[in-house]
Amino acid sequence: MHELIRLFRLAARMSGVVCLLGLPFSTACTSAYNPLQDFESVSPATELEIPKASAPRAAKYPSEQVTRGKYMVKLLGCGICHTDGALVGEPDYALNMAGSRIGIAYSNPMENKYPGVVYPSNITPDIETGIGSWSESDIVRLLRSGEASHDRQLLAVMPWPTYAWIVDSDALAIAAYLRSLPPVKHQVPENVSTGQRASSPYVHFGFYRSRH
């Protein structure tokens, strides 16, 4: 009997708790040492959801700078390409500067059945479809060098070589004006390479002469 009791006590130490039924003990259950007995149980901390990103607020710039930027944008004719419908004389002012679904062929359609086509981008500060994530320096660099994000060089359909002469104050004013526009969510078609068929309409600018 003593040997049996010793074995049960050993098992109790190993397994934590053993309930002994029908044996002459003062208690029916023997508990092993609980290493957490000196600690107080507490409720878990409340988990907070990560707030969703909100639409970017219009950047604050001096009104004189924004006015100058608006003048420069009109002078350079940015809206002719970057406003939907303007390339065919039917501008949709609800999509002012929000990009064009009508593209511009950059290779001669007289020589290429399927010319390469660029669709002017959304240059409002929309975070998803526009330039909402661009800084002032990003915009100025694009104006002067045609270098977009990720070191991507733009085709000269956008006449950035001509814009290289723009002085700092005017370039920053253009950036201020564009960043102060209301963000417009408007996705334009993807550009197509020469030889690929464009799924959206396009125009072509060029000079031609008669062969006769």
Predicted regions and their residues:
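Electrostatic cytochrome c docking/interface patches
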Residues: 44-74, 88-89
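C-terminal capping alpha-helices of c-type cytochrome domains
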Residues: 133-149, 160-188
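The canonical Cys-X-X-Cys-His
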Residues: 69, 75-85, 139, 174, ...
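N-terminal secretory signal peptides that target proteins for export/translocation
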Residues: 1-10
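C-terminal motif of bacterial Sec signal peptides marking the signal peptidase cleavage site
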Residues: 25-28
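Sec-dependent N-terminal signal peptides
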Residues: 9-21
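Gly/Gly-Pro-rich "capping" loops immediately C-terminal to redox-active cysteine motifs
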Residues: 35-51, 86-138, 154-168, 192-204
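Bacterial signal peptide processing site
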Residues: 30-32
